[in-house]
Amino acid sequence: MRVSVIGGGQVTDEQAARAEAVGRELAARGHTVVCGGRGGTMAAVCRGAKAEGGTTIGILPSERREQANDYVDVPIATGLSHARNALVPLNGDAVIALAGGVGTLSELGFAGIYDRPVVGLATHDVAAAGIDLEPVDTPEAAVDAVEAALEA
């Protein structure tokens, strides 16, 4: 399955390590990572996936595929700037949300619109927006939760 991983473009070392662990876990279980294709969470999750031999897709805000991080296998240039945030959750079967800012929050909103299963690992509280986000505590639990949601 394809799993969209969303999170901030600028992250702490702890947040990067968490994202990398999510990428490793997804790839180890045979899942493809979809993300925004740039830095921060996006680079870390792709780096983790590539370390386990996984496949990564980056949906870029610019018109240039070369702007993808070094760990993206399939860069998709959109030329849409922040509007590309609608495409990241759309192209995953489920979404894992990590720490981030308003861009991540917008992606969470689109995940709700597209009715994607959403799992949160140290991310925004979106219950008031009516988004059914399942909070988890570890990267392994995040992948367990998206797998369970898609089997239901």
Predicted regions and their residues:
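A charged, well-structured terminal subsegment
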Residues: 90-95, 136-152
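Active-site-adjacent beta-strand anchor residues
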Residues: 35-36, 98, 136
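Acidic/glycine-enriched connector segments
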Residues: 39-114, 122-126
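Hydrophobic beta-strand segments of well-ordered beta-sheets in folded domains
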Residues: 1-3, 116-119
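Hydrophobic anchor at the start of a short beta-strand
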Residues: 33, 56-57, 116-118, 133
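Amphipathic, non-transmembrane alpha-helical secondary structure
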Residues: 17-20, 24, 86, 109, ...
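Glycine-rich beta-alpha loop segments
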Residues: 1-57
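Short acidic-hydrophobic, aromatic-tinged amphipathic segments that line or gate anion-handling sites
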Residues: 75-79, 132-142
